[in-house]
Amino acid sequence: FGGKTTIFIEPLALALSKKSGGRPVKIVMSRAEVLRATGPTASASMDVKIGMTKDGYLTSGSVEFRMQGGAFGGSPVSEALQCAFASYNMPAVHHIGYDILANRPRAAAYRAPGSPMAAFAVESLIDEICTDLSLDPIDVRLKNAVKEGDKSSYGPKFKKIGLIETLEATKNHPNYSVSLEVNQGRGVAAGYWMNHGGETSVSVSLAEDGSVNVTVGTPDIGGSRASIALMTAETYGIPYDSVSVNIAETGALGFNEPTHGSRATLASGKAVYEAANQTISEMCRRVARKWQIDPDAVFWEDGYAKPAGPNAGDFSPISIKQIASEMDKTGGPIAGHHEASIRGVGHSFGVHIADVEVDPETGRVTVLRYLVVQDAGRAIHPSYVEGQFQGGAVQGIGWALNEEYVYGADGCLQNAAFLDYRIPVASDLPNIDTIIVEVPNPDHPFGVRGVGETGIAPPLPALANAVAAATKVRLRSLPMSPAKVLKAIKTGSDGC
């Protein structure tokens, strides 16, 4: 996940193509080669200190993160530092990060790079302090949650954000009050990702039948085509099925950053809104000429150009279909194009609850119940949003319990196959319950926040906190494999 966002082996294809006189080149890698060479996320070791009063107010925090970037550097340590204390309003914070070089594959992007590791360290320690002080973990987070106007731990002030609403929805969910049995535990954790915008180009054009064609440069890997169509339809006030969204080839549109950083719906949606409004303005101008009135006296509503009040004249509204059918007579094709460097971020917060059962004889962790609560800003396509929530949670569960690169004494990867690198399957998982919280993003015309990455940050600490509650032993390293959990139960520590 994420390896597609960086140039890796493509230069070899270019070199081979040039050497062969411009012939096309196809490079095929085996599964083992992909796992060995294309780059995992960075491994990390972390030191965290947190000050908290007896009644649960955070006073200070300090982190030192060491992240292994592979042989060439480039670990997500800066992103980890941004995310570490982003959920909390602390009077004093201190961040130090190191990008460590090692004889390993270069680290690659992996869903919310750096955030899951930071969340594991910080949220585990907050939970440990809450346990020592007999404080409710959600109440403590509510006391310290960042809100509009607070300065983030990494500098900028937050605009409207939904962490408090997310925590309240989590506390009110039935999962937080379900009774637990012996060897069972419940863990809570928050997570953050900053969803950037970036360089974006889109084109919008009107067809003769009144339908709208949208061309974007962000490949659809998580439902963005549908959400962009919905935002386009809402901008024009036309049915969803009147919009067609096309993904352009690289050379067919202006520059676009890849689909990464939870930016597709956030950035392309904002650009489509601007391009669509260009065409709406043009349609209003043409209708104004037809009515022989000032363009300012025409406004757009629900797919129609209408006179702006009785003083503009007694004219019947003209539909987008009629305007489109007359384009050849009123000035030719109607199209809009918008290129933008979209600054600012969406600030997405999530809170997860995990209930687990630990087998004291084998150390196996079974996830009994799992809840994802996240602020989506505005959920343009709710079922796709829920899918992103669930996908992030499942990836995080795999990271917390199973997934690990195992290197031998010779420095070679020992488990370069899915038989040995074990990802979660359906039988490993409960139903992932979701709650969509909607606190609109003030920097987006539809209130959108990117939702693709935040969901992978809370599972690591939520499960670690649940295992600690079930076993009364705190594990400080991942994954929490059966062997590691069993050792911790027997010795009282995982050795970290």
Regions picked out by a protein language model, each given a short descriptive name:
Residues S211-T215, G377-P382, P442-F446:
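Short small-residue beta-strand/loop micro-motif enriched in glycine and branched aliphatics
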